[in-house]
């Protein structure tokens, strides 16, 4: 098969005129390719493999919830699907109660839908890339950055709604000398804003690095397996077992990232709703007003 003047044979690119086969990059699995091109007036809209993967994840979650909750609710003796949904439903409130303090149960309950949707979507979205011929949505930095920034902005709005201008008191830790206040305020502001960036980078880096490692070792084991040499075949058993172990590890990392992201959201919400009774900010303002 020819592609752009090159001959593609068994997943390798053979350049005419010499050079031998050139193996495709392991990063090709993260490429975004249009499936359906749409032109709406002056705007070009394309339905890509990324869009398809996100719709499949959403459809899987909705289908699972529908199967469990149909006919008026679950069964007294839960099956595997109902047990999974109940486990997710019980896990998120317990996490909220553990990580967010100083609030009543009714106030915490308001955060449950956002945190539950984020955790459920991440739980099904991250391991999706381990399925052959699928696409890893969270392997793209723009996707993870958009998710982290939207959550960061929402948490900041919650902090202003609850505390008003007193929300700025988190910029000045308690017991800080007044000459160091400007430097620490700037440092705390940068640290606070960097939370949105760090959450997106952490998820993106874990997904891309792990999936790339599995792809590289899988390609190496596959090549060794089909070499016409018994020693290469026997030597391939080691990399093959490593690939199996790394696949299980990457699946665990993909699931644990949903847990880590949810804990981060709860910690940020706790910092936004509980300012740890920091009074140095008010003392600084009071001193300036009296002088």
Swiss-Prot record:
<keyword id="KW-0406">Ion transport</keyword>
<feature type="transmembrane region" description="Helical">
    <location>
        <begin position="140"/>
        <end position="160"/>
    </location>
</feature>
<dbReference type="GO" id="GO:0045259">
    <property type="term" value="C:proton-transporting ATP synthase complex"/>
</dbReference>
<feature type="transmembrane region" description="Helical">
    <location>
        <begin position="230"/>
        <end position="250"/>
    </location>
</feature>
<keyword id="KW-0472">Membrane</keyword>
<dbReference type="GO" id="GO:0015986">
    <property type="term" value="P:proton motive force-driven ATP synthesis"/>
</dbReference>
<comment type="function">
    <text>Mitochondrial membrane ATP synthase (F(1)F(0) ATP synthase or Complex V) produces ATP from ADP in the presence of a proton gradient across the membrane which is generated by electron transport complexes of the respiratory chain. F-type ATPases consist of two structural domains, F(1) - containing the extramembraneous catalytic core and F(0) - containing the membrane proton channel, linked together by a central stalk and a peripheral stalk. During catalysis, ATP synthesis in the catalytic domain of F(1) is coupled via a rotary mechanism of the central stalk subunits to proton translocation.</text>
</comment>
<keyword id="KW-0375">Hydrogen ion transport</keyword>
<keyword id="KW-0496">Mitochondrion</keyword>
<dbReference type="InterPro" id="IPR023011">
    <property type="entry name" value="ATP_synth_F0_asu_AS"/>
</dbReference>
<feature type="transmembrane region" description="Helical">
    <location>
        <begin position="47"/>
        <end position="67"/>
    </location>
</feature>
<dbReference type="GO" id="GO:0015078">
    <property type="term" value="F:proton transmembrane transporter activity"/>
</dbReference>
<keyword id="KW-0812">Transmembrane</keyword>
<keyword id="KW-0066">ATP synthesis</keyword>
<feature type="transmembrane region" description="Helical">
    <location>
        <begin position="207"/>
        <end position="227"/>
    </location>
</feature>
<dbReference type="GO" id="GO:0005743">
    <property type="term" value="C:mitochondrial inner membrane"/>
</dbReference>
<dbReference type="InterPro" id="IPR000568">
    <property type="entry name" value="ATP_synth_F0_asu"/>
</dbReference>
<dbReference type="InterPro" id="IPR045083">
    <property type="entry name" value="ATP_synth_F0_asu_bact/mt"/>
</dbReference>
<dbReference type="InterPro" id="IPR035908">
    <property type="entry name" value="F0_ATP_A_sf"/>
</dbReference>
<keyword id="KW-0138">CF(0)</keyword>
<keyword id="KW-0813">Transport</keyword>
<protein>
    <recommendedName>
        <fullName>ATP synthase subunit a</fullName>
    </recommendedName>
</protein>
<keyword id="KW-0999">Mitochondrion inner membrane</keyword>
<feature type="transmembrane region" description="Helical">
    <location>
        <begin position="167"/>
        <end position="187"/>
    </location>
</feature>
<dbReference type="Pfam" id="PF00119">
    <property type="entry name" value="ATP-synt_A"/>
</dbReference>
<keyword id="KW-1133">Transmembrane helix</keyword>
<comment type="subunit">
    <text>F-type ATPases have 2 components, CF(1) - the catalytic core - and CF(0) - the membrane proton channel. CF(1) has five subunits: alpha(3), beta(3), gamma(1), delta(1), epsilon(1). CF(0) has three main subunits: a, b and c.</text>
</comment>
<comment type="similarity">
    <text>Belongs to the ATPase A chain family.</text>
</comment>
């Amino acid at each position: 098969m020819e592609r752009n003047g090159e001959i593609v044979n068994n997943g390798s690119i053979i350049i005419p005129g010499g050079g031998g086969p050139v193996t495709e990059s392991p990063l090709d699995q993260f490429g975004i390719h249009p499936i359906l091109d749409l032109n709406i007036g002056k705007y070009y809209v394309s339905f890509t493999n990324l869009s398809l993967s996100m719709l499949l994840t959403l459809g899987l979650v909705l289908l699972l919830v529908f199967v469990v909750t149909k006919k008026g609710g679950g069964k007294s003796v839960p099956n595997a699907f109902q047990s999974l949904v109940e486990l997710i439903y019980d896990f998120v409130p317990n996490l909220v109660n553990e990580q967010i303090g100083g609030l009543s149960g009714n106030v915490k309950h308001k955060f449950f839908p956002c945190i539950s949707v984020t955790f459920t979507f991440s739980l099904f979205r991250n391991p999706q890339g381990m399925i052959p011929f699928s696409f890893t949505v969270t392997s793209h930095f723009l996707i993870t950055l958009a998710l982290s920034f939207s959550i960061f902005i929402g948490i900041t709005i919650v902090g202003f709604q609850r505390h008003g201008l007193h929300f700025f008191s988190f910029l000045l830790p308690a017991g800080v000398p007044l000459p160091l206040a400007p430097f620490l305020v700037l440092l705390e502001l940068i640290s606070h804003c960097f939370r949105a960036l760090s959450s997106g980078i952490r998820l993106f880096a874990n997904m891309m690095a792990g999936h790339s490692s599995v792809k590289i070792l899988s390609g190496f084991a596959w090549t060794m397996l089909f070499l016409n040499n018994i020693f290469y075949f026997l030597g391939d058993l080691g990399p093959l077992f490593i690939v199996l172990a790394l696949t299980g590890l990457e699946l665990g990392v993909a699931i644990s990232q949903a847990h880590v992201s949810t804990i981060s959201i709860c910690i940020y919400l706790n910092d936004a709703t509980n300012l740890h009774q920091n009074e140095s900010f008010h003392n600084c303002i009071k001193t300036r007003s009296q002088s």
